[in-house]
Amino acid sequence: MTTIKRYGKLVRSTKHLTDETIIYQGPGVIQNDKGKWYCQQCGTPHQDEYYTYHSKIHDQPITYCRSCLSLGRMDSFKPIYITKTAHQISLGEYHLDFELSEQQAYASSHIIRAIQQQENLLLYALTGAGKTEMMFAGIQHARQQGMNVAIVSPRVDVVIEISKRIIESFKGENIDVLYQGQSQTYQGHFVIATVHQLYRFKQHFDVIYIDEVDAFPLAMDPLLMQTLIQASASAYSHIYMTATPSSRLLKQFKKENIITLPARYHRKPLPVPKFHYFKFKPKRMQRYLLELLRKQLENQRVTLVFFNQIEAMEQALAHYQKYFKDLVAVHSEDALRFEKVEALRAGKHPIIFTTTILERGFTMAHLDVIVIDSQSFQTAALVQIAGRTGRKLQDTSGLVLFLHNGVTLSMVQAKRQIKQMNQLGLQKGWLDAEM
């Protein structure tokens, strides 16, 4: 049985520690010389997140942090412990069933260079470019040097998807997969996790890959970005990956540290969205949508139908389930969402209604997407949704249909971005097909 080591971590008890060195022992919430409170777990600088009350039991005031309560309470009374990081060399061997494309090899070499030079890098990669496989050589290089490696994403769904592929490829590595409900199994030298799990690591990781960096909640939460820094060693490399970087994100990198990857690994262009006017009415069955879905079934295509509102989706579901017995809906608040997605992969649901929970990380062959009320979606979401199609070698094309009640700038920008990436891929010689 493997002994779990808690290196470079914040722990609440020494009970399970063995040979780890404790570098901090004290309250979880402390006050600096200027009277400002600081949380050892999340580090929030916002003083309104700290609440002070008088404890009758201990007969003294106690201040606790409200910002990270869901990860366990930090206060000015109970002691916590931070352990020193440790390193362990491994072979980092991995297996791929195919050879990297020219573009993937190009990105892979830049990742290794960034790790060697302890620099940050942004991979601006088209959806389906094969980002996961681009990471492998960098992971191997880091582990052979004894570096601690983390791969993080803001979304649980993406973490689960990536972890399956990486564990399958790195069979000789002890990999911890951490998200809500999943705890550490090994020594934390190679971790795949949601970003929130990094709150528990301190000065530990030499290399962190951040997938879908633009996704909620990371893009909207500077505190989570600070968490990446706190979880990193004094010298580190952060590899950011996204298909839809914001202008704010792009400005954070030097031009030479932005690697644009406009082509998919199979050298075929990303399907370009089609626009169709359709005034959606969730409270009744609409003949156009019914016939469209029937045609999808006849063509033996799997169809994701995206909605921007859960309520509207569930109202529509009640009407269309009468015609499609295997039709289900999935959203972030759905307790059965993981089971439904697995059933979708198994071919049990040829049509599924979904919110943007499936806009990222989900891949399968013979997949088309339809967006209901596309005028209400942001550009980044539309690009991500379009990127669900044509990802597999046996099925490189697909339908991307934006049903709208009036064309918006976001729709136009999404279509333009996709066409520009396809054109750039041609110019670089990384695409075979003409547009």
Model-derived features with residue positions:
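N-terminal pre-P-loop "Q-motif" helix
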Residues: 96-119
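Interdomain "pre-motor" coupling segment immediately N-terminal to P-loop NTPase/helicase cores
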Residues: 28-87
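Conserved segment of the helicase C-terminal RecA-like domain
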Residues: 233-248, 388-417
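Conserved helicase ATPase core of P-loop NTP-dependent helicases/translocases
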Residues: 160, 173-187, 328-355
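Conserved interdomain linker/interface between the two RecA-like ATPase lobes of SF2 helicase motors
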Residues: 121, 256-318, 325-327, 429-431
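Conserved RecA-like helicase motor core of SF1/SF2 enzymes
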Residues: 212-215, 341, 345-397, 404-409
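Post-DEXD/H (motif II) to motif III coupling segment of the RecA-like Helicase ATP-binding lobe
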Residues: 203-277, 284-291
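Conserved strand-helix element at the start of the C-terminal RecA-like helicase core
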Residues: 124-132, 142, 147-162, 286, ...
